[in-house]
Amino acid sequence: MHKFRYFYIMRTHEINSVLIEYKLEELNKNQQNLLQKAHDICSVAYAPYSMFKVGASLILKNKQIINGSNQENVAYPSGLCAERVAIFNAGANFPNQIIEQIAIVAHANFELKKPIMPCGACRQAMIEYERKQGQKIEIILQVNKENIFVSESVSNLLPYAFECEELKK
């Protein structure tokens, strides 16, 4: 009787994610303007429970700016994040327009030291639009007055996103 040994070869899959850090004055005027719009809409976020306000502004290829702020609800998780408010607004009202950039900012009653990243649901929603339009969406994240992080693509924030091919099986 022969004994069989099964060998499993482990393979490593690696994806590198890049965020570039800038100072405000190093950004171009369009990026600075989009960040300001995100701050403006952040101030009207409805966040009475978390006291953590988030604003998102995106710009379409036709130069239309769409804003969104988080909208909380006492019946968690019935609220919606700023990123999805903005991106779904764009999808509903400008379905054939390309989203070029999205700026995301947060205001809290404590000092923010690191970039506030979009939640997984928002990352997946933004990836869906990036894939749908066949063009990268630049993402701009402002941490505080000094530090701003930029990624050329939302996919850098969710390198192993759920793929639509998985639904076809």
Language-model segments: residues:
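Short, Lys/Arg-enriched N-terminal segments with co-localized hydrophobic residues
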Residues: 1-9
